[in-house]
């Protein structure tokens, strides 16, 4: 297999692990390349995750942010597996002490766990896809925004809140959960609408069919920000419109045998 290794470089341990895993995988006959930031740290020829990039597998060493950042860098589908070098690591299925064992066991065709993403248009312009969520928040603290929410052209609600999360099942264990949204099995395809600190007690989260088109209109005159997967942000103003649909291109994760509820139990310590 051709395997690309991506790693956070702000900590010594992930970089050292990237080096040792690369040696191990090469000894097993794999073609190993390194994404440009970690390649620079290790003195290897860099590879850019651009439209010309190709690999059978991307191994990400880091936390959930590293995985989200890697997937947003790709403009086509490549299977990803994460090795947890962060904190919770809900998107990183492999713990450090199991990395060599699990990577050694992988072979083509890889067992895949596709995850639904949402595509986002802002004022008629595509701003990409989100694996976890798109969030509209006030650009100034303690200011309330007003949103009109439409599903398939029908207005279903109007929120006054600090913000609004439009999330995926994968994102249901991230920001949406901390805002009071439900935990949704990642094998279900749906969209979540979760208001942030709503003014009205009657404002509640929605779970919407993934085949629906969701339109969010910012009625408020106050400035706001659109943040996608915690990575990219855009300034939005009065009468801004967002269209959210199910993306035709899911994110592809390697299935290493850890079920969704096993991860919920371990990562969130519910039991």
Curated annotation (Swiss-Prot):
For this protein, the record's InterPro entries field holds: ATP-NAD_kinase_N (IPR017438), ATP-NAD_kinase_PpnK-typ_C (IPR017437), NAD/diacylglycerol_kinase_sf (IPR016064), NADK (IPR002504)
| Top-rank EC class of the record's enzyme | transferase
Q: Respond yes or no to whether keyword NADP is given for this record.
A: yes
* Enzyme Commission number, as recorded: 2.7.1.23
So where does NAD(+) get bound? 64-65, 69, 132-133, 143, 160, 162, 173-178, 197, 231
Q: Active-site positions, per UniProt?
A: 64
Q: Which UniProt keywords apply?
A: ATP-binding, Cytoplasm, Kinase, NAD, NADP, Nucleotide-binding, Transferase
- GO CC annotation, single: cytoplasm
- Any one GO BP annotation for this protein: NADP biosynthetic process
| Cofactor(s) needed by this chain | a divalent metal cation
Q: Which domain of life is it from?
A: Archaea
Q: Where's it found, cell-wise? A: Cytoplasm
Asked whether the keyword Nucleotide-binding is assigned, the reply is yes
According to UniProt, the reaction catalysed is: NAD(+) + ATP = ADP + NADP(+) + H(+)
Sum up the protein's function in the record's words: Involved in the regulation of the intracellular balance of NAD and NADP, and is a key enzyme in the biosynthesis of NADP. Catalyzes specifically the phosphorylation on 2'-hydroxyl of the adenosine moiety of NAD to yield NADP.
* Protein name according to UniProt: NAD kinase
Annotated organism of origin:
Methanocorpusculum labreanum (strain ATCC 43576 / DSM 4855 / Z)
């Amino acid at each position: 297999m051709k395997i690309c290794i991506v790693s956070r470089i702000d900590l010594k341990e992930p970089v050292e692990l990237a080096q040792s895993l690369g040696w191990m995988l090469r000894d097993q006959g794999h073609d190993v390349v390194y994404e440009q930031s970690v390649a620079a740290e290790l003195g290897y020829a860099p590879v850019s995750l651009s439209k010309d990039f190709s690999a059978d597998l991307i191994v990400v060493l880091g936390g959930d942010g590293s995985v989200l950042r890697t997937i947003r860098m790709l403009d086509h589908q490549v299977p990803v597996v994460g090795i947890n070098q962060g904190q919770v690591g809900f998107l990183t299925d492999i713990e450090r002490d199991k990395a060599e064992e699990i990577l050694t066991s992988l072979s083509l065709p890889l067992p895949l766990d596709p995850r639904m993403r949402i595509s986002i248009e802002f004022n008629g312009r595509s701003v990409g896809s989100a694996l976890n969520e798109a969030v509209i928040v006030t650009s100034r603290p303690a200011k309330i925004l007003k949103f009109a929410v439409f599903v398939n052209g029908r207005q279903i609600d109007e929120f006054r809140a600090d913000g609004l999360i439009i999330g995926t099942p994968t994102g249901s264990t991230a920001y949406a959960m901390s805002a009071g949204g439900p935990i949704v099995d990642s094998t279900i395809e749906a969209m979540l609408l979760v208001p942030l600190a709503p003014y009205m007690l009657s404002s509640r989260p929605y779970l919407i069919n993934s085949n629906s088109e969701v339109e969010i209109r910012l009625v408020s005159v106050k400035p706001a920000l659109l943040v996608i997967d915690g990575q990219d942000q855009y300034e939005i103003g009065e009468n801004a419109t967002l269209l959210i649909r199910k993306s035709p291109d899911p994110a592809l994760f390697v299935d290493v045998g850890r079920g969704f509820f096993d991860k919920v139990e371990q990562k969130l310590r519910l039991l």
